[in-house]
Amino acid sequence: MRILGIDPGLARVGYGVIDTSNGQQQMLDCGIIRTNPGIDDGVRMVEIASDLRQLIRRWKPQLAAVEKFFFYRSSTTISVVQARGVIIMTLARFRVPMVEFPPMQIKLALAGSGHAEKDEVLDAVMRELNLDQPPRPDDAADALAIALTGWFQR
């Protein structure tokens, strides 16, 4: 199974693609979709949708796993929620089934504790994907953790 993990954001959307078809997890790609904060949010949303569309066409994921947020009060809440909506819409448009996980569930699935530290989750990502170096940037590593959670929780 090919899984696309997504760490939503407006300035940076992390993505990670894993393949599990050979009985073990393998990283195929990871990175970020970066938008320019100096341009209109609507244009940034179009860029996110366009880049995500390219990723879907290239990797043909059978499942997308997306981090689910629980916001309190934050000045970036609305824009991140809007970007997340664009991501969900793009996945639906290409008929990619989607699952969502809150951060605590991702930490629990990877590190065994919903209160695990970021480095514990990163160590688990490296171990599960047999990586010698940590994936960079952090948003891409987070997206790989989300993709792995999608595989573990299927």
Curated annotation (Swiss-Prot):
Free-text comment on the cofactor:
Binds 2 Mg(2+) ion per subunit.
Cofactor dependency: Mg(2+)
Q: Which GO terms describe its cellular component?
A: cytoplasm; Holliday junction resolvase complex
Major site of localization recorded for this protein: cytoplasm
User: Where is this gene product found?
Assistant: Cytoplasm
Q: Where is the active site?
A: D7, E67, D139
Q: Which residues bind Mg(2+) 1?
A: D7, D139
CDD domains recorded: RuvC
The GO terms this record gives for MF are:
crossover junction DNA endonuclease activity; DNA binding; magnesium ion binding
Which UniProt keywords are listed? Cytoplasm, DNA damage, DNA recombination, DNA repair, DNA-binding, Endonuclease, Hydrolase, Magnesium, Metal-binding, Nuclease
Q: What does this protein do?
A: The RuvA-RuvB-RuvC complex processes Holliday junction (HJ) DNA during genetic recombination and DNA repair. Endonuclease that resolves HJ intermediates. Cleaves cruciform DNA by making single-stranded nicks across the HJ at symmetrical positions within the homologous arms, yielding a 5'-phosphate and a 3'-hydroxyl group; requires a central core of homology in the junction. The consensus cleavage sequence is 5'-(A/T)TT(C/G)-3'. Cleavage occurs on the 3'-side of the TT dinucleotide at the point of strand exchange.
On subunit structure and binding partners, the annotation says: Homodimer which binds Holliday junction (HJ) DNA. The HJ becomes 2-fold symmetrical on binding to RuvC with unstacked arms; it has a different conformation from HJ DNA in complex with RuvA. In the full resolvosome a probable DNA-RuvA(4)-RuvB(12)-RuvC(2) complex forms which resolves the HJ.
Q: Which family does it belong to?
A: Belongs to the RuvC family.
- Which protein is depicted? Crossover junction endodeoxyribonuclease RuvC
Give the source lineage, highest ranks first. Bacteria, Bacillati, Cyanobacteriota, Cyanophyceae, Synechococcales
Q: Which gene encodes it?
A: ruvC
